[in-house]
Amino acid sequence: MKDKIIKKATDMFLKLGFKSVTMDDIACEMCISKKTIYKYFSNKERLIEEGTEVVHQKIHALMDEVISQNHNAIAENFQMREMFKEMFQSFDQSPAYQLKKHYPEIYQKMMENEIEDCSQMFRQNIEKGITQGLYRQETD
């Protein structure tokens, strides 16, 4: 039930905005009581935190999928950049803006995680490219 609540709430947050979706809205949409939601989440902020973690995991899984295709480093880099471009073109900026404005701590944590993962992935890509002889050794 907890995973179902996270999935539905996250879908609603991304579609309608973090601030505008209430616990009542989520309960009504799922045909459950608010008490059921509060059984798993102490407050809306906790639900948002877990929802953003699920989104982070999905993005990480997409990155892992690209890496697992064993392209050379340059092709992998281009495919990864194309994936991010598509992801952010279809990404509605309103929920991200609301998250930043109304839940800045959650937004900051989410951005730190994404930046760290992307930086690590690009560092690994550079190392792979150097090993494959596609990138120069002295690349910073």
What are these model-predicted stretches?
Residues 50, 54, 61-91:
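Hydrophobic alpha-helical connector segments
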Residues 4, 8, 12-46, 50:
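Helix-turn-helix
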Residues 43-46, 72, 140:
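Residue-level recognition of oxygen-bearing side chains
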Residues 85, 89-123, 131-138:
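Short secondary-structure transition hinges
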Residues 18, 68-72, 135:
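Alpha-helical structural elements of signaling/regulatory helical domains
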